[in-house]
């Protein structure tokens, strides 16, 4: 029966690694960042201008008609004077041509831990990378659908900043055409990564105005600059959207390469996902929108929506708006903004285990203030939850160890007669009340928890650059000196010594190799995950040693 346990452990080791690779196949993005050395070490700033370009190109503005192709627009030069906006959590630049957000930094999230003053950059349109949030008015009279190109807005200032004590900042961009006055308004709130983008349409033209609001996210095929996992596992980089039938529908770059998507959706959201961060347009819940994905002539990927027809009578005024979220994947914040948006924190098929783990881990952290110690306490709680099951398993293993001399005698007695040997072993197990597969139960129980915790550490932005103690400065990446994996291998070896020795020499050799194999796997796993396994092993060793000693003492007493 020991061979079954050996095979099970080996299979679980292989399965766990294959599952990680499978996650990479299903959710990963093979493309790598196309940044030069200078770009990786210099802070991505917000320059005053961007190169002249083809911002009025057809690929930028969707058609208001769901059945037609994107509108063909004449090119127009970009403005060289970007409008810069700074709040306590956002630093961004708006191009007055079209009013697109072409650059956005997150000052609360450093790009690298060793350079805390260099903020992580989400949106960028400076040449190295294309990633921006666009919105406008298209349709019959929409200024973004003009043959002459997208509108050139004017602002009262070139820079805006949320002052100390100020809770809200409003930035107005103005444009007039054919008797219609437009205000594109950006509203920011202190401490918030979502902003309201609204259009105030004042029709003084003497005739009715008709158009549609659109909003979209445009990105090139470059890799994910926020992905720093060292396991060889890439997190999902691609688009996603909400529908009534599918609250979280992913649309990868490969899907967009195969063909455009168009769906009629009431409310919902469209988003672009990357490791730790998400950008999303959230229209009004009551609006019936046409959601679309496509690829433009420059090879950029676009996901967006076009809203319902807006009618403004002569002399009338109308306001329409949408929310834009650009920031970290904070589940509580995302859930407040729109149903299903919190699902962009993708824990995979074990989400039903991962979500309670994260909830508990978050509450522990609120008390301790350190994610490393929180993982240790979480491990102790999980171990306590499965204590009865583990205790039963260790008692079975201890009894196996106690009857080892009897098993050796049976082997000597029956020699190569495996049938009689197996029958005699089963009778002995039954007599001694031993479950030969009992030692496998803790591994079977721990593996789903282990994998769920892996995805919690991989996906939760709260773990990004979270230190523990001493050399562990980031629990979301590998131990830089491989100390924790080596300690884990040592604890596995000690735990193995407490187990009964397999009667077959080949099985014994395989079992001795397991700590080495697991140590090799764990060298590149997140330090937080290895910490969990080390603490779990230490608790298991203590529990197993105590139970084994008690049973051995009872056996000696009975024999006396």
Swiss-Prot record:
Residues 42-66 are annotated as: Disordered. It is a multi-pass membrane protein. NCBIfam families: PRK01318.1-3, PRK01318.1-4, yidC_nterm, yidC_oxa1_cterm. Belongs to the OXA1/ALB3/YidC family. Type 1 subfamily. The gene is yidC. It is found in: Cell inner membrane. InterPro entries: Membr_insert_YidC (IPR019998), Membr_insert_YidC_N (IPR028053), YidC/ALB3/OXA1/COX18 (IPR001708), YidC/Oxa/ALB_C (IPR028055), YidC_ALB_C (IPR047196), YidC_periplasmic_sf (IPR038221). Disulfide bonds: none annotated. Keywords: Cell inner membrane, Cell membrane, Chaperone, Membrane, Protein transport, Transmembrane, Transmembrane helix, Transport. Pfam families: 60KD_IMP, YidC_periplas. One of its GO terms (cellular component) is plasma membrane. This is Membrane protein insertase YidC. The chain crosses the membrane at residues 1-21, 341-361, 367-387, 437-457, 468-488, 515-535. Required for the insertion and/or proper folding and/or complex formation of integral membrane proteins into the membrane. Involved in integration of membrane proteins that insert both dependently and independently of the Sec translocase complex, as well as at least some lipoproteins. Aids folding of multispanning membrane proteins. Its main location: membrane. Interacts with the Sec translocase complex via SecD. Specifically interacts with transmembrane segments of nascent integral membrane proteins during membrane integration. One of its GO terms (molecular function) is membrane insertase activity. One of its GO terms (biological process) is protein insertion into membrane. It comes from the Bacteria.
């Amino acid at each position: 029966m020991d061979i079954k346990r050996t095979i099970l452990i080996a299979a679980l080791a292989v399965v766990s690694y294959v599952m990680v690779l499978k996650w990479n196949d299903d959710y990963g993005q093979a493309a790598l960042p196309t940044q030069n050395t200078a770009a990786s070490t210099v802070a991505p700033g917000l320059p005053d201008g961007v190169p002249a370009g083809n911002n009025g190109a057809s690929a930028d503005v969707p058609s208001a008609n769901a059945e037609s192709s994107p509108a063909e627009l004449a090119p127009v030069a970009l403005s060289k004077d970007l409008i810069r906006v700074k709040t306590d959590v956002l630093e961004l630049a708006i191009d007055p041509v079209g009013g697109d957000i072409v650059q956005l930094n997150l000052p609360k999230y450093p790009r690298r831990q060793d350079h805390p003053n260099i903020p992580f950059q989400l949106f960028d349109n400076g040449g190295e990378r294309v990633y921006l949030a666009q919105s406008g008015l298209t349709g019959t009279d929409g200024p973004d659908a003009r043959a002459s190109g997208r509108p050139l807005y004017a602002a009262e200032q070139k820079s805006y900043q949320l002052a100390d004590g100020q809770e809200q900042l409003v930035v107005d961009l103005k444009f007039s055409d054919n008797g219609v006055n437009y205000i594109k308004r950006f509203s920011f709130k202190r401490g918030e990564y979502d902003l309201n983008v609204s259009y105030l349409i004042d029709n003084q033209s003497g005739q009715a105005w008709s158009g549609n609001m659109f909003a979209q996210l445009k990105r090139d095929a470059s890799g994910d600059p926020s992905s720093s996992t060292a396991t060889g596992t890439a997190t999902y980089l691609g688009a996603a959207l909400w529908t009534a039938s599918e609250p979280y529908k992913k649309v990868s770059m490969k899907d967009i390469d195969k063909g455009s998507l168009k769906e009629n959706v009431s409310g919902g959201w469209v988003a672009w996902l990357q490791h730790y961060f998400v950008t999303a347009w959230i229209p009004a819940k009551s609006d019936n929108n046409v959601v679309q994905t496509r690829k433009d002539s420059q090879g950029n990927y676009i996901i967006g929506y076009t809203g319902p027809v807006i009618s403004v009578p002569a002399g009338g005024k109308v306001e329409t708006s949408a929310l834009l979220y650009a920031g970290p994947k904070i589940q509580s914040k995302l859930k407040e903004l729109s149903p299903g948006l919190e699902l962009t924190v993708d824990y995979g098929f074990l989400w039903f285990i991962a979500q309670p783990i994260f909830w508990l881990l978050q509450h522990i952290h609120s008390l301790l203030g350190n994610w490393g110690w929180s993982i240790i306490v979480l491990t102790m709680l999980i171990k306590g939850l499965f204590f009865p099951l583990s205790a039963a398993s260790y008692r079975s293993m201890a009894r196996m160890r106690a009857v080892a001399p009897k098993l050796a005698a049976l082997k000597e007695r029956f020699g190569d007669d495996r049938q009689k040997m197996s029958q005699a072993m089963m009778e002995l197990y039954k007599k001694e009340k031993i479950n030969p597969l009992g030692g496998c139960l803790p591994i079977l129980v721990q593996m789903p928890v282990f994998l769920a915790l892996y995805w919690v550490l991989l996906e939760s932005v709260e773990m990004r650059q979270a230190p523990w103690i001493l050399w562990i400065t980031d629990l979301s990446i590998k131990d830089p000196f491989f100390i924790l994996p080596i300690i884990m291998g040592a604890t596995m070896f000690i735990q193995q010594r407490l187990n009964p020795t397999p009667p077959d020499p080949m099985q014994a050799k395989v079992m001795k190799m397991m700590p080495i194999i697991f140590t090799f796997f764990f060298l590149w796993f997140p330090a937080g995950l290895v910490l969990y396994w080390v603490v779990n092993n230490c608790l298991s060793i203590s529990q197993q040693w105590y139970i084994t000693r008690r049973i051995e003492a009872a056996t000696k007493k009975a024999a006396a």
